[in-house]
């Protein structure tokens, strides 16, 4: 059974069409009008081995806030829907990713209990034209809509681009681990019987 989901979301601020395949090959085709997010989502797909296709337009003449936030919403919804009943998944994922002087860790629990613990500081407020505070907005919406417990910890680093890139790569790897099917797991990995 294919674990993929396709959606379109249109608001007064953004118009997003998206397709996500959890069991992909790391293929990506991303058009958002926000070059830095395109770079990060391309990395996210490659390092998570997800196939991710996104076409988004938004009010980027104002700033990238709405587009970045709504991308988190849409990718989160796609993850949740692609997982279906969550039968057989590992549920938990943990990844450390170094990027030169930076070390980032991301831990995921696909628990149906949304929470974001975000322990990252960015030395610069911008990377190019991209506002770095939007990284938190993206991951909060991702966690909320995917209904996952997401912990992001940057152990150290001083280059803002490296810090953000390490976070996205670590999130991809942790999510790949958490969504992986383990044939030893019968049903859902919870004593409650559901997630």
UniProtKB/Swiss-Prot annotation:
Keyword Membrane: no
Broadest EC class assigned to this enzyme: lyase
GO biological process: L-histidine biosynthetic process
Pathway as given in its UniProt record: Amino-acid biosynthesis; L-histidine biosynthesis; L-histidine from 5-phospho-alpha-D-ribose 1-diphosphate: step 6/9
Catalytic activity: D-erythro-1-(imidazol-4-yl)glycerol 3-phosphate = 3-(imidazol-4-yl)-2-oxopropyl phosphate + H2O
UniProt key word Lyase: yes
One Pfam family hit: IGPD
EC number: 4.2.1.19
Keywords in alphabetical order: Amino-acid biosynthesis, Cytoplasm, Histidine biosynthesis, Lyase
Cross-referenced InterPro entries: IGPD_sf (IPR038494), ImidazoleglycerolP_deHydtase (IPR000807), ImidazoleglycerP_deHydtase_CS (IPR020565), Ribosomal_Su5_D2-typ_SF (IPR020568)
Compartment(s) of residence: Cytoplasm
Gene3D superfamilies: Imidazole glycerol phosphate dehydratase, domain 1 (3.30.230.40)
Family: Belongs to the imidazoleglycerol-phosphate dehydratase family.
Matches recorded under PANTHER family: IMIDAZOLEGLYCEROL-PHOSPHATE DEHYDRATASE (PTHR23133:SF2), IMIDAZOLEGLYCEROL-PHOSPHATE DEHYDRATASE HIS7 (PTHR23133)
Name under which the protein is recorded: Imidazoleglycerol-phosphate dehydratase
Species of origin: Shouchella clausii (strain KSM-K16)
Gene name of this polypeptide: hisB
